[in-house]
């Protein structure tokens, strides 16, 4: 962000990776991302079958909930047809990415970089174009989950709900927009729940719907820094017990950039040990 000739703030979109930091750091609250709340409500009013695809980070975003069933009840009270935890897509992502790693590293690539964050992916490809081939092309858990649900219910629409505004960028991409119809941040979801006067704590929970889905702990761990790499490494270890996969992780775009600089300079050892 810089000032133009009149002193007005401008965003340099050639450098923007949609990380959302400007939203939280602007002292005047003058920057906002493009919301889809109106379009979602219109879908509810039309009677569209809309699934809520909830990122596993909801556990930390809504710590006051006694159970996942409370969140599911709240989302259904808003008008969602059903609720699916995106961690199940993370499990599919783990398997697919583990296969890719075994196929590519070290035979074709000296390391593989991965993250489900579209802001990270854009930063990496923009700042390190020569490392684009090292970035995993596996679909994100959001896309895996949305496609899985659309295969099961082709007429339904999908709304991803997560912590980060960058997912709106991912959902707008040509290859994804037919899979994910809406994106809400947890902040937007909390605002809708409050506007509808839904008392989440006192909602009745259907005994058969206490849990969302039976995703693995590794899939839910995608929300943590280094969680994706750990899940993939553990899956490879499960298939090849004698293989040692080195992991280097970072938190935040600044640390990620430093890590990629080290990888580019071959100062990180991330290749697996030779396979038998």
Language-model regions, residue ranges each:
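Iron-sulfur-cluster electron-transfer modules
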Residues: 1-152
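Glycine-rich beta-alpha junction loops
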Residues: 56, 117, 162-168, 187-190
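Short beta-strand/loop segments at the ligand-binding rim of alpha/beta enzyme cores
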Residues: 155-158
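Internal gly/pro-rich beta-alpha loop/helix module
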Residues: 169-176, 182
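Glycine-rich phosphate-binding loop plus the immediately following alpha-helix
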Residues: 182-203, 225-226
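A conserved mid-domain beta-alpha-beta active-site/ligand-binding segment of alpha/beta enzyme cores
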Residues: 202-234
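Acidic/aromatic/glycine-rich contiguous surface patches that form carbohydrate-binding/processing clefts
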Residues: 246-259
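Conserved small/polar residues in nucleotide/adenosyl-binding loops
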Residues: 269-276
């Amino acid at each position: 962000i810089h000032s133009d000739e009149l002193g007005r703030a401008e965003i340099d979109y050639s450098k923007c990776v949609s990380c959302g930091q400007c939203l939280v750091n602007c002292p005047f609250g003058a920057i906002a991302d493009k919301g889809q709340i109106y379009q979602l409500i219109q879908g509810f009013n039309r009677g569209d079958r809309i699934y809520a695809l909830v990122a596993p980070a909801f556990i930390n975003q809504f710590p006051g909930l006694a159970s996942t069933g409370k969140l599911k009840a709240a989302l259904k009270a808003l008008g969602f047809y059903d609720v699916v935890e995106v961690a199940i897509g993370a499990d599919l992502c783990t398997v697919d990415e583990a296969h890719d790693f075994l196929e590519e590293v070290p035979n074709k690539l000296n390391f593989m970089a991965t993250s489900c964050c579209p802001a990270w992916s854009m930063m990496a490809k923009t700042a390190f174009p020569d490392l684009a081939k090292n970035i995993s092309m596996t679909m994100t858990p959001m896309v895996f989950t949305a496609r899985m649900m659309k295969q099961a219910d082709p007429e339904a629409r999908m709304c991803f709900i997560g912590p980060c505004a960058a997912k709106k960028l991912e959902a707008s991409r040509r290859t994804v927009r037919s899979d994910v119809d809406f994106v809400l941040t947890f902040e937007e979801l909390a605002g809708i729940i409050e506007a509808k006067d839904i008392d989440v704590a006192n909602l009745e929970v259907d005994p058969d719907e206490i849990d969302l889905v039976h995703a693995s702990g590794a899939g839910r761990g995608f929300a943590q820094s280094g969680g994706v790499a750990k899940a993939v490494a553990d899956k490879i270890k499960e298939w090849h017990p004698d293989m040692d996969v080195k992991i280097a992780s970072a938190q935040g775009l600044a640390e990620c950039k430093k890590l990629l600089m080290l990888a580019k300079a071959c100062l990180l050892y991330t290749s697996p040990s030779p396979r038998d």
